[in-house]
Protein backbone atom coordinates (compact mmCIF):
# COMPACT_ATOMS: atom_id res chain seq x y z
CA UNK A 1 0.00 0.00 0.00
CA UNK A 2 2.82 2.41 0.83
CA UNK A 3 4.28 1.94 -2.65
CA UNK A 4 0.99 2.93 -4.24
CA UNK A 5 0.61 5.92 -1.93
CA UNK A 6 4.17 7.04 -2.67
CA UNK A 7 3.36 6.87 -6.38
CA UNK A 8 0.55 9.40 -5.85
CA UNK A 9 2.80 11.78 -3.92
CA UNK A 10 5.73 11.61 -6.34
CA UNK A 11 3.33 12.31 -9.21
CA UNK A 12 1.86 15.28 -7.31
CA UNK A 13 -1.72 14.00 -7.15
CA UNK A 14 -3.89 16.82 -5.77
CA UNK A 15 -7.06 14.87 -4.85
CA UNK A 16 -6.33 11.67 -2.92
CA UNK A 17 -8.94 9.23 -1.58
CA UNK A 18 -7.72 6.55 0.82
CA UNK A 19 -11.04 4.94 1.69
CA UNK A 20 -10.98 1.41 3.05
CA UNK A 21 -14.11 -0.57 3.79
CA UNK A 22 -15.44 -2.55 6.72
CA UNK A 23 -17.82 -2.02 9.61
CA UNK A 24 -18.90 1.58 10.17
CA UNK A 25 -17.60 1.47 13.73
CA UNK A 26 -14.35 3.30 14.40
CA UNK A 27 -13.12 0.36 16.43
CA UNK A 28 -9.54 0.84 17.59
CA UNK A 29 -9.01 -2.95 17.52
CA UNK A 30 -9.81 -3.13 13.81
CA UNK A 31 -6.78 -3.06 11.49
CA UNK A 32 -6.45 0.33 9.81
CA UNK A 33 -3.92 1.77 7.42
CA UNK A 34 -1.23 3.68 9.29
CA UNK A 35 -0.55 6.85 7.33
CA UNK A 36 3.01 6.88 6.06
CA UNK A 37 5.25 9.72 7.19
CA UNK A 38 5.87 10.88 3.63
CA UNK A 39 2.12 11.26 3.12
CA UNK A 40 1.76 13.32 6.30
CA UNK A 41 4.34 15.77 4.93
CA UNK A 42 3.03 15.87 1.37
CA UNK A 43 2.77 19.50 0.23
CA UNK A 44 0.90 18.89 -3.04
CA UNK A 45 -2.43 17.43 -1.86
CA UNK A 46 -5.38 19.81 -1.95
CA UNK A 47 -8.13 17.31 -1.05
CA UNK A 48 -7.58 14.30 1.19
CA UNK A 49 -10.29 11.80 2.13
CA UNK A 50 -9.39 9.13 4.69
CA UNK A 51 -11.51 6.17 5.80
CA UNK A 52 -10.24 3.52 8.23
CA UNK A 53 -6.87 5.21 8.35
CA UNK A 54 -4.95 6.05 11.50
CA UNK A 55 -2.34 8.58 12.50
CA UNK A 56 0.74 8.10 14.61
CA UNK A 57 0.21 9.08 18.25
CA UNK A 58 1.83 12.49 17.74
CA UNK A 59 2.04 12.87 13.97
CA UNK A 60 4.16 15.41 12.16
CA UNK A 61 1.82 17.07 9.68
CA UNK A 62 2.83 19.41 6.86
CA UNK A 63 -0.04 19.81 4.40
CA UNK A 64 0.65 23.32 3.18
CA UNK A 65 -1.64 23.08 0.12
CA UNK A 66 -4.49 21.11 1.69
CA UNK A 67 -7.87 22.86 1.63
CA UNK A 68 -10.32 19.96 2.18
CA UNK A 69 -9.84 17.14 4.70
CA UNK A 70 -12.37 14.37 5.37
CA UNK A 71 -11.72 11.73 8.01
CA UNK A 72 -14.16 8.92 8.74
CA UNK A 73 -14.14 5.80 10.92
CA UNK A 74 -11.15 6.89 12.96
CA UNK A 75 -10.10 7.38 16.57
CA UNK A 76 -8.59 10.80 17.21
CA UNK A 77 -6.83 12.36 20.18
CA UNK A 78 -6.46 16.00 21.13
CA UNK A 79 -2.81 15.99 19.99
CA UNK A 80 -3.71 14.50 16.61
CA UNK A 81 -6.33 17.16 15.94
CA UNK A 82 -3.98 19.94 17.03
CA UNK A 83 -1.16 18.70 14.80
CA UNK A 84 -3.50 18.35 11.83
CA UNK A 85 -4.76 21.92 12.18
CA UNK A 86 -1.32 23.41 12.83
CA UNK A 87 0.10 21.59 9.82
CA UNK A 88 -2.71 22.62 7.45
CA UNK A 89 -2.58 26.44 7.27
CA UNK A 90 -4.75 26.61 4.12
CA UNK A 91 -7.49 24.24 5.34
CA UNK A 92 -10.99 25.61 4.68
CA UNK A 93 -13.14 22.47 5.07
CA UNK A 94 -12.87 19.77 7.75
CA UNK A 95 -15.25 16.83 8.10
CA UNK A 96 -14.94 14.24 10.87
CA UNK A 97 -17.47 11.45 10.33
CA UNK A 98 -18.10 8.37 12.49
CA UNK A 99 -15.17 9.30 14.68
CA UNK A 100 -14.39 8.86 18.36
CA UNK A 101 -12.39 11.15 20.61
CA UNK A 102 -10.09 9.40 23.01
CA UNK A 103 -6.94 9.75 25.06
CA UNK A 104 -3.64 8.07 24.36
CA UNK A 105 -5.04 5.02 26.15
CA UNK A 106 -8.54 3.74 26.81
CA UNK A 107 -9.00 5.72 30.02
CA UNK A 108 -7.05 8.91 29.30
CA UNK A 109 -9.82 10.98 27.76
CA UNK A 110 -11.81 11.62 30.90
CA UNK A 111 -12.26 15.35 31.44
CA UNK A 112 -9.89 16.24 28.60
CA UNK A 113 -10.72 19.23 26.41
CA UNK A 114 -10.38 19.10 22.65
CA UNK A 115 -9.70 22.39 20.88
CA UNK A 116 -10.47 22.95 17.20
CA UNK A 117 -8.52 26.12 16.53
CA UNK A 118 -8.11 27.44 12.99
CA UNK A 119 -8.23 30.87 11.36
CA UNK A 120 -8.53 29.43 7.83
CA UNK A 121 -11.42 27.04 8.48
CA UNK A 122 -14.74 28.00 6.87
CA UNK A 123 -16.70 24.73 7.00
CA UNK A 124 -16.71 22.25 9.89
CA UNK A 125 -18.76 19.05 10.10
CA UNK A 126 -18.64 16.77 13.15
CA UNK A 127 -20.56 13.48 13.12
CA UNK A 128 -19.78 11.37 16.16
CA UNK A 129 -19.99 7.65 16.77
CA UNK A 130 -21.47 6.07 19.88
CA UNK A 131 -18.17 5.34 21.58
CA UNK A 132 -16.60 4.20 24.80
CA UNK A 133 -16.49 7.76 26.12
CA UNK A 134 -19.95 7.10 27.57
CA UNK A 135 -18.08 5.51 30.47
CA UNK A 136 -15.86 8.54 31.03
CA UNK A 137 -16.39 11.98 32.52
CA UNK A 138 -17.65 15.02 30.65
CA UNK A 139 -15.30 16.66 28.15
CA UNK A 140 -15.45 19.97 26.32
CA UNK A 141 -15.00 20.38 22.57
CA UNK A 142 -13.93 23.98 22.07
CA UNK A 143 -14.36 25.50 18.61
CA UNK A 144 -12.27 28.58 17.96
CA UNK A 145 -12.51 29.46 14.27
CA UNK A 146 -13.25 33.17 13.70
CA UNK A 147 -13.79 32.78 9.94
CA UNK A 148 -16.08 29.73 10.17
CA UNK A 149 -19.19 30.11 7.98
CA UNK A 150 -20.84 26.67 8.28
CA UNK A 151 -21.01 24.38 11.31
CA UNK A 152 -22.73 21.00 11.58
CA UNK A 153 -22.73 18.81 14.71
CA UNK A 154 -24.53 15.46 14.42
CA UNK A 155 -24.40 11.83 15.49
CA UNK A 156 -23.72 10.52 18.98
CA UNK A 157 -21.99 13.00 21.26
CA UNK A 158 -22.23 11.39 24.66
CA UNK A 159 -20.97 13.60 27.53
CA UNK A 160 -19.68 16.21 25.09
CA UNK A 161 -20.07 19.91 25.76
CA UNK A 162 -19.57 22.17 22.74
CA UNK A 163 -18.19 25.59 23.41
CA UNK A 164 -17.85 28.36 20.83
CA UNK A 165 -15.13 30.86 21.61
CA UNK A 166 -14.29 34.18 20.00
CA UNK A 167 -16.68 35.92 17.62
CA UNK A 168 -17.62 33.54 14.82
CA UNK A 169 -18.70 34.52 11.31
CA UNK A 170 -21.29 31.74 11.06
CA UNK A 171 -24.11 32.10 8.56
CA UNK A 172 -25.49 28.56 8.89
CA UNK A 173 -25.49 25.98 11.67
CA UNK A 174 -27.04 22.52 11.88
CA UNK A 175 -27.44 20.74 15.21
CA UNK A 176 -28.48 17.10 15.00
CA UNK A 177 -26.50 15.36 17.71
CA UNK A 178 -27.79 13.03 20.41
CA UNK A 179 -26.50 12.77 23.97
CA UNK A 180 -27.58 9.32 25.07
CA UNK A 181 -27.72 8.53 28.77
CA UNK A 182 -27.61 5.39 30.86
CA UNK A 183 -30.50 4.71 33.23
CA UNK A 184 -28.21 5.42 36.16
CA UNK A 185 -28.10 9.16 36.78
CA UNK A 186 -30.35 9.89 33.81
CA UNK A 187 -32.06 12.91 35.38
CA UNK A 188 -28.81 14.61 36.33
CA UNK A 189 -27.31 13.82 32.90
CA UNK A 190 -30.24 15.37 31.06
CA UNK A 191 -30.10 18.43 33.31
CA UNK A 192 -26.44 18.95 32.45
CA UNK A 193 -27.16 18.38 28.75
CA UNK A 194 -30.08 20.84 28.79
CA UNK A 195 -27.92 23.55 30.32
CA UNK A 196 -25.09 22.88 27.87
CA UNK A 197 -27.47 23.02 24.90
CA UNK A 198 -29.01 26.27 26.13
CA UNK A 199 -25.55 27.79 26.49
CA UNK A 200 -24.67 26.72 22.95
CA UNK A 201 -27.90 28.11 21.49
CA UNK A 202 -27.33 31.47 23.16
CA UNK A 203 -24.06 31.68 21.23
CA UNK A 204 -25.97 31.04 17.99
CA UNK A 205 -28.75 33.62 18.32
CA UNK A 206 -27.23 35.83 15.63
CA UNK A 207 -26.98 33.04 13.01
CA UNK A 208 -29.13 33.77 9.90
CA UNK A 209 -29.95 30.06 9.42
CA UNK A 210 -30.15 27.61 12.33
CA UNK A 211 -31.50 24.05 11.97
CA UNK A 212 -32.15 21.90 15.03
CA UNK A 213 -33.21 18.25 14.71
CA UNK A 214 -35.42 16.35 17.15
CA UNK A 215 -32.38 14.45 18.45
CA UNK A 216 -31.20 17.59 20.21
CA UNK A 217 -34.53 18.37 21.86
Predicted regions and their residues:
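Residue-level marker for the onset of beta-strands and adjacent loop->beta junctions
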Residues: 44, 137-139, 158-160
Amino acid sequence: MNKWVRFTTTHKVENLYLEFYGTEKANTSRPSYLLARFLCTNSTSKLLSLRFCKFATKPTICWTSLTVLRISCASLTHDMIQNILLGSPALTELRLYNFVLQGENDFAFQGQNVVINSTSLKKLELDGEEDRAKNYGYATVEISAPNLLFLSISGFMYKRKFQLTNELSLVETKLGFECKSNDYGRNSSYLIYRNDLRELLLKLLHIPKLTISTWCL
